[in-house]
């Protein structure tokens, strides 16, 4: 039986339920993590981070031609369908300037992570070129290992270490570089305690107790920052003004709708010419990203058609 997942982008490859038989052929280690639902249907043990990692390996190999993918223990293991949705909606945003999705777009991923997930999907789906920034040397090493282990990715994805504490674009966007868009999945929580509480909530939702030796994944820089998501994105907005002519669209995920008003005020303060909100849904989970530009319609058309 094939059930539609509500709300996924039309081009998302994950509308149907996972074909577990095929995915287990792609990655045989997934078999040990299969379980039966109360209805008697096969599923994956999503409470086990090793199961989620095995599922991701299979999905990335089967749908995105990433034959070799792994991340160190303790790092975020992202749900692939939701990450793909951001990429597809971003493609629609880039298409508005010329009517077609640019095949050679240059994208900056702020906080590429150990998993390198957005570049992997974007390169396969649209042939885009990516620059990924990261503060963690361990995450950067993991992402580089993924790139090096898969033929062709070295030409499409480059990585840069953010060495300046608190900086986002400064030190990453070089003097004469131009990007069609930036993307970011910002730290969500405002403290380590809040991050721990979030993990505890996940445990409860999965019916687990504190003694279950689980690591849902996430290093400090992935899960929390001083002031949380709003402070991080406001800093991004503030810095973006300095790169107004080098980047067509700045974008960021926003986890909670109630965080939008202060961000809209910050965008007004820096003089953003256009602001767009893209709503997304993966199953029961609602999410969104905001996008802003300092270029008018004609400037964006010229930017898309520039020599590369």
UniProtKB/Swiss-Prot annotation:
Cellular component GO terms, alphabetical: cytoplasm
SUPFAM superfamilies, A to Z: S-adenosyl-L-methionine-dependent methyltransferases
Subcellular location field: Cytoplasm
Top-level lineage group: Bacteria
EC identifiers of the protein: 2.1.1.181
Catalytic activity annotation: adenosine(1618) in 23S rRNA + S-adenosyl-L-methionine = N(6)-methyladenosine(1618) in 23S rRNA + S-adenosyl-L-homocysteine + H(+)
InterPro entries in the cross-refs: METTL16/RlmF, rRNA_lsu_MeTfrase_F, SAM-dependent_MTases_sf
The protein's name in its UniProt record: Ribosomal RNA large subunit methyltransferase F
């Amino acid at each position: 039986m094939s059930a539609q997942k509500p709300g996924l982008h039309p081009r998302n490859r994950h509308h149907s339920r996972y074909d577990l038989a095929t995915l287990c052929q792609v990655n045989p280690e997934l078999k040990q993590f299969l379980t039966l639902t109360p209805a008697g249907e096969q599923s994956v043990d999503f409470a086990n981070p090793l199961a989620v990692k095995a599922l991701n390996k299979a999905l990335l190999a089967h749908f995105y031609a990433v034959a070799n993918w792994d991340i160190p223990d303790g790092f975020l293991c992202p749900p692939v369908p939701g990450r793909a949705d951001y990429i597809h909606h971003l493609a629609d945003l880039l298409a508005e300037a010329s009517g077609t999705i640019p095949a050679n777009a240059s994208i900056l991923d702020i906080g590429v992570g150990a998993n390198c997930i957005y570049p992997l999907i974007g390169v396969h789906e649209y042939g885009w070129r990516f620059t990924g920034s990261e503060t963690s040397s361990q995450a950067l090493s993991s992402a580089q290992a993924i790139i090096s282990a898969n033929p062709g990715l070295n030409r499409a994805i480059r990585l840069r270490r953010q060495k300046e504490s608190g900086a986002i674009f400064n030190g990453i966007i070089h003097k004469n570089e131009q990007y069609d868009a930036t993307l970011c999945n910002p730290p969500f929580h405002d403290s380590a305690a809040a991050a721990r509480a979030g993990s505890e909530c996940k445990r409860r939702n999965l019916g687990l107790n504190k003694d279950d030796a689980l690591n849902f994944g996430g290093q400090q820089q992935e899960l929390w920052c001083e002031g949380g998501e709003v402070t991080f994105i406001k800093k991004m907005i503030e810095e973006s003004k300095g790169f107004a002519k080098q980047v067509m669209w700045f974008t960021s995920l926003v986890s909670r709708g109630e965080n939008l008003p202060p961000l809209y005020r910050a965008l007004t303060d820096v003089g953003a010419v256009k602001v767009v909100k893209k709503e997304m849904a993966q199953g029961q989970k609602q999410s969104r990203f905001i996008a802003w530009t300092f270029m008018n319609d004609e400037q964006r058309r010229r930017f898309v058609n520039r020599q590369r």
